[in-house]
UniProtKB/Swiss-Prot annotation:
Region (Disordered), start-end ranges: 80-110
Biased composition (Low complexity): 80-89
Keyword flag NAD: no
Species annotation: Saccharomyces cerevisiae (strain Lalvin EC1118 / Prise de mousse) (Baker's yeast)
Sorted UniProt keywords: Membrane, Phosphoprotein, Sporulation, Transmembrane, Transmembrane helix
Modified residues (Phosphoserine): S102
UniProt keyword Ribonucleoprotein, yes or no: no
Family: Belongs to the OSW5 family.
Compartments reported by the entry: Membrane
Listed GO biological process terms: sporulation resulting in formation of a cellular spore
Full protein name: Outer spore wall protein 5
Cytoplasmic side: 1-7, 51-148
Topological domains annotated Extracellular: 29
InterPro entries: Osw5 (IPR031430)
Length: 148
């Protein structure tokens, strides 16, 4: 006769083989599908990296081209003429004058309003920040570029 231990050994062996067979029916196709998706992830990552590198190259070249055009435009513009202020200089007070009260220092008298005497007037140049930056770019370029 067959002992009880041998009988249960063959029962467990049979169950293990049957369950392993049915699980392999699911695992092997799913493993193949995951392999296909992994190939897709790698290939799309490669394509994404290549398209980014190409776009970066296009951007750098376009930026360099636009900078050259801007330098040429800066060389062709006439320097801005400094205009005299409309008010005579005698009415303007220097900023460094310590006798002018500052509105920020008048915390002891909170009820006092800011008057014309409290405001510091400075002559303002007619040039804008863009015009100054173009002149700076033209000076740095050393007049290398000429439009033809």
């Amino acid at each position: 006769m067959v002992s009880t231990a041998t009988f249960f050994f063959f029962v467990y062996l049979t169950l293990f083989v049957v369950i392993g067979f049915f699980s392999s029916l699911f695992i092997i196709p799913l493993l193949g599908i995951s392999f296909v998706f992994a190939i897709g992830v790698v290939s799309f990552g490669f394509c994404s990296n290549m398209s980014f590198k190409m776009a970066q190259l296009i951007y750098v070249r376009a930026d360099a081209f636009l900078k050259k055009v801007l330098d040429k435009m800066a060389l062709q513009t006439q320097p801005a003429q400094l205009q005299e202020p409309q008010e005579p200089l005698s009415t303007l007070r220097p900023v460094s004058n310590p006798t002018i009260p500052s509105p920020l220092r008048q915390t002891a008298r909170p009820s006092k309003f800011v008057t014309e005497e409290d405001v510091i007037f400075e002559p303002v140049s007619a040039q804008s920040a863009i015009a100054r930056s173009l002149e700076t770019a033209a000076n740095k370029a050393g007049n290398k570029f000429q439009l033809s």
